[in-house]
Regions:
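N-terminal auxiliary "cap/dimerization" subdomain that precedes the catalytic jelly-roll/cupin core
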Residues: 1-96
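Conserved aromatic-histidine-acidic binding/catalytic patches
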Residues: 35, 111, 161-164
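A short, structural micro-pattern
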Residues: 68, 139, 167, 214, ...
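Catalytic core of Fe(II)/2-oxoglutarate
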Residues: 186-249
Length: 249
């Protein structure tokens, strides 16, 4: 059965601060992301080779083998960006009932990737977006970055095995880096304390979703292979900004 995919509700980059304040989320098209960063899309697309070299996630409690990932942490304060010593990823059980409450150590992002000017620029702009969303002047943001590949080698892959959730941070950014040979993977965003929701499917590489984590919950539906017996994948980058230190400190 083929289901219609809803297109993302793209906004212009200049509308981003108001959209985050008014509805708690915003979606930029790849062209919008390029404009927002002041960088050619090709510089972002050049990062994609990294996703072919992500080690398996050894912590999946559903017994799955469908997720590979890398992780890195930074502090972002205005134009100052610093990578911090590699550390575990930790979330409280309140925010991640499946994998919360445990120290999860993932392989670090490649040094060559985090040294790229476009990577530094992305973190800087996300810090600015977080400050604008919270109505603060430039302040330190504690940033975690996650490279994910979800594959369908086992028949089904779950981008968010924990279900609809919040991350316990201020700003969440989810970029679709690429997808191939899969159906599904619909993004769903709901008001945390209301009834409004939005659903759409990100299909173009470097489509970017930004979320006010205090106001909305989010999930992505499972992916399946387009053709039985042919494995596919969905690659994403998730970056979170938190004001009061890293979770677990």
């Amino acid at each position: 059965v083929t289901t219609a995919a809803f297109a993302p509700p793209f906004i212009e980059p200049g509308e981003l601060p108001a959209a985050l304040r008014e509805q708690g989320y915003a979606v930029l098209s790849p062209q919008g992301v390029s404009e927002w960063l002041g960088a050619p899309l090709a510089q972002l697309e050049a990062l994609h080779a990294d996703w072919n070299d992500l080690p398996p996630d050894a912590y999946l409690k559903d017994g799955g083998r469908y997720r590979t990932r890398r992780h890195a942490c930074f502090t972002v304060d205005g134009e100052s960006i610093a990578q911090v010593p590699h550390r575990a990823h930790w979330q409280p059980v309140e925010y991640n009932a499946l994998h919360g409450g445990m120290q999860r150590w993932f392989a670090p992002m490649h040094e060559a990737t985090v040294a790229q000017p476009v990577w530094q620029r992305l973190l800087q702009r996300l810090g600015e977006a977080a400050s604008g969303m919270r109505g603060t002047k430039a302040q330190p943001w504690f940033v975690e970055a996650h490279q994910f590949r979800i594959d369908t080698a086992g028949g089904i892959g779950r981008p968010t095995p924990e279900g609809a959730h919040r991350d316990g941070v201020d700003l969440v950014a989810v970029a679709l880096v690429g997808r191939s040979g899969v159906k599904g993977g619909e993004t769903r965003v709901f008001e945390a304390s209301g009834r409004r929701g939005e659903r759409f499917t990100m299909t173009e590489p470097w489509t970017l979703l930004l979320l006010d984590d205090a106001r909305v919950i989010h999930e992505s539906t499972p992916i399946q292979p387009l053709e039985e017996g042919t494995a596919g994948w969905r690659d994403t980058l998730v970056v979170t900004c938190r004001a009061q230190g890293f979770q677990g400190d």
